[in-house]
């Protein structure tokens, strides 16, 4: 079905049969419409609209296979296909150019193309001015040159020198940056690739961003004037839009805040689509440059090609599908573009504990953030979604769980709401790692949704035993600290099996031992006014006081007077994992009241357990968004690394390799940039792992074996192991027999005063 010379067509037709009939009719169709095809088909590589009748022209080789590409299931079903591959360059480099606005970026496209790049993409400010980008790409955004729009220009070569040489002229433009590091290139491309999800919901657009006019294309030399006129058309209809796309090929991706909630909004949508079609045709372009026409744009094809060529499309389809059974109503004889718009969702919006300020306070809007991108189904890279990577079950992916919440709120498939066992079972293996919060382009936050669900699911009925054994660990720890020897004897001795069964703990788990003394017992308040408040969390205070003591030494080495809260306080971190939100709220209110003077004074708070810092930076402001004290405490709470970097602390030197296992909550909420910078200043060769590892015993073993344990084995016994999270250190100890250090211990151990 490839290129077919005229003589070969004659032979096929003479042979008869169904193939001969098809080729005869295709050639006859081509001959009748050849003049119109040559006259009206846009001359650009990104023309996806209509059928590829131009591939039947003699000068195109009568290529039947190409003529069928992009028919969108209306003519045939492909069973297999052969494709021609081109060798990829061995080395790539990236030049990024910043512009005042997206039109200025588009104006540069023809000149940039003269440098013969292998890729030229563009994006506007909406792709970087959103919560997902700020959370996930903090370090990457700092690499971008100043501007409100950017061109990303890729060059390739067989060697690094060859690729750099090809990029050199463009990289010399004022304000341009040359990115040679493959890792940094990947991170910049990820910002662009996240466009479809990051622009689907952005309050700066004025509403949700929708497809519809999302992949139009024009010749690259006409791209800028087309974009300028499209912006004017959008403004006339009161629409906002976010732009990105394949600028080097004149293909523009757009997310537009169409109003589908009212009859007037839908009428405006239709008018815009018709006028936008006329606009793109006037510039010699195509309604679709990538995604196809379907029903949404099929009705508009006569405006692009004229009625005669649409008749030719109809005849082309009839050759393959005389009964019109293949995807009817699409492309040919298309249903009206506004005939089958899904009505606004009528989802239940029950009262909730969290505020969901980014979703107008609506749980239904929060859980319907998912647009199906499926990044949670990746097999490697990042921390999302560890349970799915083990089970490979869609219901254990962030996307699958979001869909179950949708079904729960819709009430047709999942009918028992908060009491649903299907939803609870799907959430059971969720680690509440918050990985999706930072890595899902749509900003799905399954850890929060899980806490919300469990809060309601267990209202008025007993919770599973682990909820009481581990969720209430701050209270058990305070009791055990009075007689730690007795407590450890019970937990490590003959009665440990009974205690594990009572607490719902796997028999192969080891229960961590309480320290012989607490950190608070031995802490000496500073002389003089304190300059920093150290947060002695439950795990550090009762299990590892030596970490807090090391932190005090480091902070004093940095010139600070260290205080701690006057009362024993706990942020309630374990409570969220079990949905015990009423108790968690009470804990946070106690903290806000107890720390009122320190909060008012702006005293920095340094946390040592990443998940506790994450509570202050995330859950606190989600539960109390209108509380000024909550907002201030959130903004003045730091990890140890963040605080030391912010203060300009010069750490002591320490050489060697360091394997750093970042707590999943830290990676999701605070990031690891400060840790990387501080350890790098020390002279350590840092490898930051991208992995999760805790939760249900069997699942946690499988998750740990994916990245964490192989990395530790490969590092060798001489490498430093760093893990600030209590659960992370315990998992490493129990699975490898090695002790991972807290950052405070590493810095204090290298400090001159520590060895004095």
Per-region residue spans from a language model:
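Terminal amphipathic helices with adjacent charged low-complexity linkers/tails
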Residues: 2-15, 81-88, 106-109, 113-207, ...
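Conserved phosphate/anionic-ligand binding catalytic regions in large, soluble enzymes, centered on
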Residues: 61-86, 245-251, 255, 287-288, ...
